[in-house]
A protein has these predicted regions:
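A glycine- and charged-residue-rich anion-binding loop/surface
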Residues: 1-59
Length: 59
């Protein structure tokens, strides 16, 4: 799956990942500061598992 981040960069994963796991992949500081995610415009919990291509913003 391909995750498109707010800045336009893309991350590719072979398996499903939670929003918090992706945040840790980007930066430990980001993951610690995160309180939610926004997936395709919808606010979701950090434990939400992403299985398909989407746009992600860490909040």
């Amino acid at each position: 799956m391909i995750i498109t981040l707010k800045d336009g960069s893309k991350k590719e994963y072979a398996e499903a990942k939670s929003v918090i796991d992706i945040a840790y992949d980007i930066s430990e500081g980001l993951a610690r500061a995160a309180c939610a995610g926004e997936v395709n415009g919808e606010v979701v919990d950090l434990r939400t598992v992403l299985e398909d291509d989407c746009e992600l913003n860490i909040l």
